[in-house]
UniProtKB/Swiss-Prot annotation:
It comes from Drosophila melanogaster (Fruit fly). Glycans are attached at residues 77, 267, 305, 361, 422, 680, 692, 718, 746, 936, 970, 1012, 1122, 1152, 1171. This is Chaoptin. It is found in: Cell membrane. GO terms for biological process: homophilic cell adhesion via plasma membrane adhesion molecules; microvillus organization; rhabdomere development; visual perception. It is a peripheral membrane protein.
Length: 1315
């Protein structure tokens, strides 16, 4: 018996070990993929536009991101490639057989213009391609034929496309390989039975963000035995599809958040199989419409380890609400809960481990709520209104098991640590988060009965003013402390004495009110790794402040008033582990010699937005690992030679937005020798690039100085002269040179003619009148040349003859009347832009046959071209896919003139006012053309055009009284039809015969009525509709009811229509995401008055201005997250128009309005909105004031709004204290959203509840630049950023100046009377 036991134990142990190994290998594989995504590689040898992990003929991992590549790089076709990533490159096509010799494992093409995948696109990769990622393209169907033979494909991502249907055979051939299938953010409205038939090893299926309103019970009837993750978030499901989920026996994660589910009970109209019981690890039900959880709500669930109800309007939890399921973790945050039955969780007494009820409206906890709970470990009641009346009885049952307790929040009743300690005897407590203490200081007696197990302590928003000596002597195991959002002025020297060995993170952001960094208390923290004293009043720190912090890795001191960093503050032998320092937004005035010296681990150094005007020699020296150094937004006007010395791995040096009068290569000594050094000195005050002292000749030993700069940005200066030979120190290193937005007059060989590795040259937005014929004599590797927005009238014929690899040329916005013959002699041309010139004909003779053969895009708009001859578009343009000849003077299009361009997919002939389009004008394009623009060409009838593959057809601004029915037959695949600003008097009947129509624009037509039948017959899957600027006199609210899948609607606030109301119009449209509201435009209507001989005609003036109070009264759709108010007739908006918002997120835009200001209380009436982004960039010339949108002091407080993003560049505002809130908000944003420190979110918040996850950090720097490009009209055009930093002193608490002045006056008056 004993031997048998050991055998069984051995087999079990072996099995478990094998499973763990498999799991670890898969986890490591996914981690490896993520590492591959994030790792930075050097530029490719063959093309520096991309990065490669290898430099040989085997290129390894290739990244091409944010650089123009209309076609795949030719180097890929000539090498082995492990991974290829093409992101936002303008790619339009994957050529058949192009990748066949690469042996590729992973292909990612995202953010491009792929409209289809050829059947032979992946020929040769049948046994090598494992991952195919094609999101954010223009695909409309699953490329099943091209995928069919990929035997190893395990990961397929087709998200963010326009796919509408899934066929039975869409994934044929992938049955034995596909494990992950991502179809999120497409246009799928229904799933047919057996849609995923045969995918027996599929593990993850993502259908998020589609238009699914129900799931067919037979969709997963085959069982899909390995499917563990099913993501259905952000659809329009009204119930949980229990019958469809029944066959999925391995399902562990079900995400149906952001739908319109009202109940967990299922459909009452038919019986759900009793055997359908779900066993899940994660059930996501966030942001649905669940209002109540009745008893036995989980009758179709057996086990649910984690259940998420966040954001549902649940107000009451009844008894046995979670019966009969076994649930370990419940997250019910920001629901508006006001009442919980004392026996609501009684069915979970043996299973519940985590209960998070943060952000609700609970005022009390019943003292029997947690009775009999044996395993409850985490309780979070953060940001409620709770007053615990019987604390001892409330927590008595869990005082042995509770590990984490969160009672923080300034609406909760004040927490007395002594009472908390007595009521719980929490000897096992690991994490505690509280606010509003009964006392103003923390002392040793406060933690007397807490155990050494306490590791994480957060006391925020508690109005603390002091920390006493030995305050933590009873909790010696503390690892993390957070005292943010306090007013601590005193920290006694021995406050941290007992936790110096254990504390690894200390955060006191916006929590310390002293003027000097408390160095003495910090000397005990020898194990500290992260220190955050940001967003305070600190103005000084001693040179020994951090000398005892030998393990420090991250130091955040941004948003203070520090004036100087003394030499010796950071020392290499002490701070050998320091990786990142943030001193941005302080008052530093200079950087002295050896300030940052010998810090061997330092990788990032942030010094942006100070007052630095001088940097001394060797200020930055011997920083072997430094990769990023930002000095952006200072006042630097004096940069000493060799200021930067021995920084071999520096990749980015940002000195933009300073006051540099010149730029000298002598600033650098051994900088960037091991990296791809990018130096940004844009937005300075450089007027001349004079002869460099670094090239004054050879030194006494005969050597020369050489720079390692590869990317140099000198744009947005006022450079008018570049001395010959100026770039000589960098000639052999430069690959990118940006000189746009300057005042250059010409280009010469002495400046640009000897840069053998230069591949990107930007000279746009200058005053260039002429180009020397030999300007690029020895600059033979140029790929991209930008000469747009200059004054060129002539191009030398031989200027590009030495250039071998030219691909992209931009001559737009010049004065060119033509281009010389054979200007582009060598092959490889991909894009030519000569728009906005004075061209008289298509410059076909300027491209040799070799150059024209590879051309993909040709931009000819806004010229004087009057005819297109067959010779102009001869057989040379066999690869052309994009042709724009809009805004010219074309008169006629000959028959079949485009027939010699078999790949032409996009053609724009708009705004040729006298153009005559014949029936046969597009002959030859039947199988290729996808987008056609014929706007504003004076059409009165639509020619009979047969383009069966056309998807987008623009006919706006013509004179069409009707649209023939035959058009629908000839363009049966049409998806977007623009008929705006014609003479249509009703919705054309032909729109009913377009089965794939998704976008319909009818704006500006003289349509007078919309009734309940107006859109009957139009494809019910229509997603975008524009019905703005009609001349309506009759309107019915059911006119849009036949379009249930509408996502985007543009309409006018028809104020002249009685009872016109937008929320009522959208009451049944649960899928609306975007709403564009146009201001009513005035128009006249002639009506008959009287009868008989006394009858007379009367003119009525309609379309009067409105503030939208009546038109926006009511509840808006719950998915509505994007609202735009547009039109110069908007002069005022009512402060309550967004009171009906039911989404937690809102992006609001003001576009071309006449608003002078938003109402002061506008953002106080935002419904359920918690996070708002505001965009006022476009044509709001009268707007001068913006009230503070923030109604909460920190992000994501219940019943309050926090601004997440603000875009207002190129606007002129009044910069006074009414706008002073922007500075306060900026600091909060950097504190909570842009912080480098994340431990407070992962430690003090329960699962998946981090503000950083909500907001992200991707646009933190972009926001700062937006404020730099916003000007102060009342301060002579000063940058708003500079005004906020130094001029607008409006008080730390964002007090209004007038209010503060009023208070001061009243106090003075009171004192006078008292005296």
């Amino acid at each position: 018996m004993g031997l048998e036991f050991f055998f069984k134990f051995g087999y079990a142990f072996l099995t478990i070990t094998l499973m763990i190994m498999i799991w670890m290998s898969l986890a490591r594989a996914s981690m490896f993929d993520r590492e591959m995504e994030e790792t930075h590689y050097p530029p490719c040898t063959y093309n520096v536009m991309c990065t490669c992990s290898k430099s040989s003929t085997d290129l390894g991992i290739v990244h091409c991101k944010n650089v123009p590549f209309p076609a795949l790089p030719r180097m890929v076709n000539q090498s082995k490639v492990f991974m290829l990533h093409m992101e936002n490159t303008g790619l339009r096509e994957i050529e058949p057989y192009f990748l066949q010799s690469t042996g590729m494992y992973r292909l990612k093409i995202s953010g491009n213009h792929l409209t289809e995948i050829p059947d032979d696109a992946f020929t040769g990769l049948e046994r090598s391609l494992w991952e195919l990622i094609l999101p954010q393209n223009d695909l409309v169907e699953i490329p099943s034929k091209s995928l069919r033979h990929l035997q190893k494909l395990r990961h397929l991502d087709l998200g963010y496309n326009h796919i509408t249907h899934i066929q039975h055979d869409s994934f044929r051939g992938l049955e034995d390989s596909l494990q992950t299938l991502i179809l999120r953010e497409n246009c799928i409205s229904q799933l047919m039975s057996h849609s995923f038939s045969g995918l027996l090893i599929l593990e993850t299926l993502d259908l998020s963000g589609n238009n699914l309103f129900e799931i067919d019970p037979n969709v997963f009837v085959d069982g899909m035995p390995r499917l563990t993750r099913l993501l259905l978030t952000d659809n329009i499901l009204s119930e949980i599809p229990y019958d469809a989920l029944g066959p999925l026996k391995s399902l562990r994660t079900l995400d149906i958040s952001h739908n319109v589910i009202w109940s967990l009970s299922g459909n009452e109209t038919y019986e759900i199989k009793a055997s359908t019981k779900l066993n899940l690890d994660n059930l996501h039900l966030e942001y649905n419409h669940i209002e109540v959880l009745p008893p036995n709500s989980f009758k179709y669930f057996d086990t649910v380890n984690r259940t998420f109800f966040d954001g549902n309007p649940i107000h009451t939890l009844r008894e046995d609400a979670f019966k009969p399921a076994r649930i370990r973790e419940i997250y019910m945050r920001y629901c508006g809960l006001t009442n919980i039955s004392p026996v609501a969780f009684d069915s979970l007494v043996n299973s519940l481990q985590i209960l998070d009820l943060s952000g609700n409206n609970l005022t009390k906890l019943h003292h029997k709520l947690f009775n009999n709970f044996d395993v409850l470990r985490v309780i979070s009641m953060r940001d409620n209104k709770i007053k615990i009346q019987k604390p001892t009885e409330t927590f008595n049952a869990v005082h042995y098991t509770l590990l984490k307790l969160d009672l923080s929040g300034d609406r909760n009743d004040p927490t007395n640590l002594q009472t908390l300690r007595n009521m719980t005897r929490m000897r096992n407590m690991r994490s505690l988060s509280i606010s509003r203490l009964g006392s103003s200081s923390v002392g040793p007696e406060d933690f007397k009965d807490f155990g050494v197990e306490l590791e994480d302590l957060q006391i925020t928003r508690a109005s603390l003013s002091g920390i006493q000596s030995h305050a933590f002597k009873h909790v010696r195991g503390l690892k993390r402390l957070d005292f943010s959002e306090n007013g601590i002025s005193s920290i006694e020297n021995d406050a941290f004495h007992e936790i110096g060995h254990s504390l690894i993170s200390l955060k006191m952001s916006h929590g310390y009110s002293g003027s000097a960094l408390p160095a003495e208390p910090l000397r005990h923290l020898t194990s500290l790794q992260e220190l955050d004293f940001s967003n305070n009043h600190i103005s000084s720190m001693s040179d020994t402040s951090f000398h005892f912090l030998k393990n420090l890795r991250l130091l955040e001191l941004h948003d203070n008033r520090i004036e100087q960093v003394l030499k010796g503050t950071f020392q290499g032998d002490i701070h050998s582990k320091l990786e990142e320092i943030s001193l941005r937004f302080n008052h530093l005035t200079s950087i002295s010699q050896h300030t940052f010296f010998d810090l061997e681990a330092l990788r990032k150094l942030h010094l942006d937005d100070n007052k630095i005007d001088k940097i001394e020699r060797r200020a930055f020296m011997n920083l072997d690992e430094l990769e990023y150094l930002s000095l952006r937004g200072n006042k630097i006007n004096n940069l000493a030679d060799e200021s930067f010395q021995n920084l071999p791995k520096l990749e980015i040096l940002d000195m933009a937005f300073n006051q540099l009068p010149n730029f000298n290569f002598d600033y650098f000594d051994q900088v960037g020798t091991l990296s791809n050094l990018n130096v940004n000195v844009s937005h300075n005050q450089i007027r001349q690039l004079m002869y460099n002292s670094s090239w004054s000749g050879r030194n006494e030993h005969g050597g020369m100085y050489h720079s390692n700069i590869k990317i140099l940005d000198l744009s947005h200066n006022n450079i008018s002269i570049i001395h010959p030979g100026y770039f000589r120190p960098a000639e052999i290193s430069l690959t990118h040179l940006h000189l746009g937005y300057n005042s250059l007059m010409n280009t010469t060989r002495d400046v640009f003619g000897n840069m053998p590795h230069l591949q990107w040259l930007d000279l746009s937005y200058n005053w260039i009148h002429e180009l020397d014929f030999d300007a690029f004599k020895n600059t033979k590797q140029l790929q991209l040349v930008f000469f747009g927005h200059n004054y060129l009238s002539d191009i030398p014929q031989d200027i590009f003859k030495p250039v071998q690899g030219l691909r992209i040329v931009d001559f737009s916005h010049n004065h060119l009347r033509g281009l010389p013959d054979n200007l582009f002699y060598n092959g490889g041309m991909e894009k030519l832009d000569v728009s906005h010139n004075m061209m008289l004909k298509i410059p076909s003779s300027s491209l040799s046959s070799l150059a024209a053969l590879t051309l993909c895009e040709l931009h000819l708009s806004n010229n004087f071209i009057s005819t297109i001859h067959s010779m102009d578009l001869s057989n040379k343009f066999r690869s052309l896919r994009y042709l724009d000849i809009s805004y010219n003077y074309l008169l006629r299009i000959d028959d079949a003139v485009f027939a010699t361009m078999p790949k032409l997919a996009v053609l724009d002939l708009s705004h040729n006012r006298d153009l005559k389009v014949m029936d046969k004008s597009f002959m030859g394009l039947e199988n290729s053309l996808i987008k056609l623009g014929l706007e504003n060409i004076s059409l009165s009838t639509v020619p009979e055009i047969r383009l069966k593959y056309l998807r987008e057809f623009r006919l706006g601004y013509n004179e069409l009284p009707s649209i023939p029915q035959e058009l629908a037959h000839n363009m049966s695949n049409l998806r977007m039809l623009d008929l705006s600003n014609n003479d249509l008097t009703n919705v054309p009947l032909m729109t009913q015969a377009l089965p794939h129509l998704r976008r319909l624009m009818l704006s500006g037509n003289p349509i007078t009525s919309l009734n309940n039948n107006s859109f009957d017959g139009v494809n019910e899957d229509l997603e975008m509709l524009d019905i703005s600027n009609f001349r309506l006199h009759y309107f019915e609210y059911g006119c849009l009811d036949s379009l249930p899948h509408l996502r985007s609607l543009k309409l006018t606030a028809y104020s002249h229509l009685e009872h016109f109301n937008i929320p009522h119009l959208l009451r049944h449209h649960y899928n609306i995401r975007q709403l564009w509201i146009e201001a009513p435009q005035p128009f006249t209507r002639i009506v008959k008055k009287g009868s008989g001989p006394t009858q007379e005609m009367q003119t009525l003036q309609l379309g009067n201005p409105t503030d939208l109070q009546r038109e926006m009264e009511g509840h808006l759709p719950s998915k509505l997250t994007n609202i735009t108010f547009s039109g110069p007739q908007f002069t005022n908006l009512n402060e309550r128009i967004l009171r009906g918002m039911r989404s937690p997120y809102l992006y609001m835009q003001l576009f071309n309005t006449s608003l002078q200001a938003l109402p002061p209380n506008f953002f106080k009436y935002m419904g359920r909105v918690r996070n708002i982004s505001l965009d006022i960039r476009y044509h709001n010339r009268n707007l001068k004031k913006i009230p503070n949108p923030n109604t909460g002091a920190v992000p994501y407080l219940p019943n309050s709004v926090f601004l997440t993003d603000l875009k207002m560049s190129h606007t002129d505002l009044n910069c006074d204290c009414d706008l002073g809130w922007v500075e306060f908000w900026q600091r909060k944003r950097r504190q909570y959203i842009c912080s480098s420190q994340t431990w407070t979110d992962t430690v003090f918040r329960t699962f998946m509840n981090s503000p950083c996850q909500v907001y992200g950090r991707h646009n933190c720097d972009e926001h700062d630049d937006d404020l730099r490009e916003t000007r102060c009209e009342n301060k002579g055009g000063q940058q708003l950023m500079e005004a906020l930093k130094f001029d607008l002193e409006c008080g730390w608490d964002n007090a209004n100046c007038r209010e503060a002045a009023f208070v001061v006056v009243m106090v003075c008056v009171a004192m006078v009377f008292w005296m």
